[in-house]
Amino acid sequence: CVQSCSFGPLTWSCDGNTK
């Protein structure tokens, strides 16, 4: 999979994982 990280105001998702 491609490692893509998206940072949001509340939650962030990286490589299809959300924390």
Swiss-Prot record:
Record-level Gene Ontology MF annotations: signaling receptor binding
GO biological process: defense response to bacterium; killing of cells of another organism
Lineage: Bacteria, Bacillati, Actinomycetota, Actinomycetes, Kitasatosporales
Covalent cross-link site, Beta-methyllanthionine (Cys-Thr): 1-18, 5-11
Pfam family, one: DurB-like
Function: Acts as an inhibitor of angiotensin I converting enzyme.
Crosslink site: Lanthionine (Ser-Cys): 4-14
Organism: Streptomyces sp. (strain A647P-2)
Post-translation changes: Maturation of lantibiotics involves the enzymatic conversion of Thr, and Ser into dehydrated AA and the formation of thioether bonds with cysteine or the formation of dialkylamine bonds with lysine. This is followed by membrane translocation and cleavage of the modified precursor.
KW Disulfide bond (keyword) present: no
Keywords: Antibiotic, Antimicrobial, Bacteriocin, Lantibiotic, Thioether bond
Cross-link (Lysinoalanine (Ser-Lys)): 6-19
Protein name according to UniProt: Lantibiotic ancovenin
Family recorded in the similarity comment: Belongs to the type B lantibiotic family.
